[in-house]
């Protein structure tokens, strides 16, 4: 079964996340574990590793790290992605999220809906960038990419 069965965020930031960011993290993890598609392609003449997988996301030396293990915690693989392609979309996503969280407190539903549509658009762009960056390393569907993008944002800014 090619899916993620456990996810861990290796958060080394000394600054605790805000309540909103922690909520986003918890929802993304819950949704990701409920339904996801995560497969590793065949590499170097070897058959593809079979899931389910345990995934740890971390930032080390300025790079996004995917540490992938079997359900029995045996190392399956690890790959690193440059954070450069994510910087602008993560920044945009957090700016629109701040606007959204403020809007929920004081604006009418029609204005909240407009901000939420923009937020979803930026979120979709982040998922698209992630899918592109994962090409040849891991295969994910768009919903899994969206949830992983949320966790990358939390890791990056949390």
Swiss-Prot record:
HAMAP family recorded: UPF0262 (MF_00678)
Protein name: UPF0262 protein RHOS4_22360
Pfam family, one: UPF0262
InterPro entries tied to this protein: UCP032146
Record family assignment: Belongs to the UPF0262 family.
Originating species: Cereibacter sphaeroides (strain ATCC 17023 / DSM 158 / JCM 6121 / CCUG 31486 / LMG 2827 / NBRC 12203 / NCIMB 8253 / ATH 2.4.1.)
């Amino acid at each position: 079964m090619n899916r993620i069965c456990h996810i861990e965020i290796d958060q080394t930031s000394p600054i605790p996340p805000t309540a909103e960011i922690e909520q986003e993290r918890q929802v993304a993890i819950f949704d990701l574990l409920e339904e996801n598609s995560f497969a590793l392609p065949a590499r170097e003449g070897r058959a593809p590793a079979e899931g389910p997988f345990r995934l740890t996301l971390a930032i080390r030396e300025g790079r996004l790290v995917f540490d992938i293990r079997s359900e029995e915690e045996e190392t399956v693989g690890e790959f690193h992605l440059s954070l450069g392609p994510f910087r602008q979309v993560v920044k945009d996503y957090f700016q629109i999220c701040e606007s959204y969280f403020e809007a929920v407190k004081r604006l009418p539903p029609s204005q909240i809906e407009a901000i939420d549509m923009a937020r979803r658009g930026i979120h979709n762009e982040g998922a698209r960038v992630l899918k592109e960056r994962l090409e040849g390393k891991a295969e994910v569907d768009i919903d899994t990419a969206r949830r992983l993008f949320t966790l990358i944002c939390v890791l990056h800014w949390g």
